[in-house]
């Protein structure tokens, strides 16, 4: 897969391209998961130094052994969980909160726990 970097492209379009190029090709992805990803811009959940590449198909390393998983892996995990809108979800080690934000569009309640304050700032 080839990605072309375009300066000043807005987050919504980058997010849409990520969904089309990385998540939809997985096949069988539930519509509600695609909608959840559409409503959360990945660049809102990464530090400034990672924003330029945050929509690429790779994990985003934050520090030490902490990172934000690549979007297609998050989508596979969330799909396997088969979360309903009546469920409460606990996310332990939520990092920057990106996956929690997506899950919040699917579940009744999401509680995120992160011990590293730097990742939340």
Task: Place the predicted regions along the sequence by residue.
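Conserved SAM-binding loop and adjacent beta-strand
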Residues: 27-28, 43-50, 60-78, 82-83
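Residue-level signal for well-ordered alpha-helical scaffold segments within enzymatic catalytic domains
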Residues: 21, 76-80, 105
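Short, conserved active-site loops that position catalytic residues or coordinate cofactors/metal ions
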Residues: 57
């Amino acid at each position: 897969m080839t990605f072309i970097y375009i300066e000043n492209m807005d987050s919504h379009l980058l997010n849409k391209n990520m969904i089309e190029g990385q998540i939809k090709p997985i096949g069988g992805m539930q519509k509600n998961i695609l909608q959840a990803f559409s409503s959360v811009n990945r660049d809102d959940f990464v530090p400034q130094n990672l924003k330029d590449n945050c929509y690429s198909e790779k994990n985003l390393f934050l520090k030490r052994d902490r990172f934000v998983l690549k979007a297609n892996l998050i989508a596979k995990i969330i799909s396997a969980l088969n979360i309903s809108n009546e469920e409460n979800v606990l996310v332990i080690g939520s990092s920057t909160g990106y996956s929690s934000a997506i899950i919040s569009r699917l579940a009744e309640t999401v509680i995120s726990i992160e011990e590293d304050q730097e990742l939340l700032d």
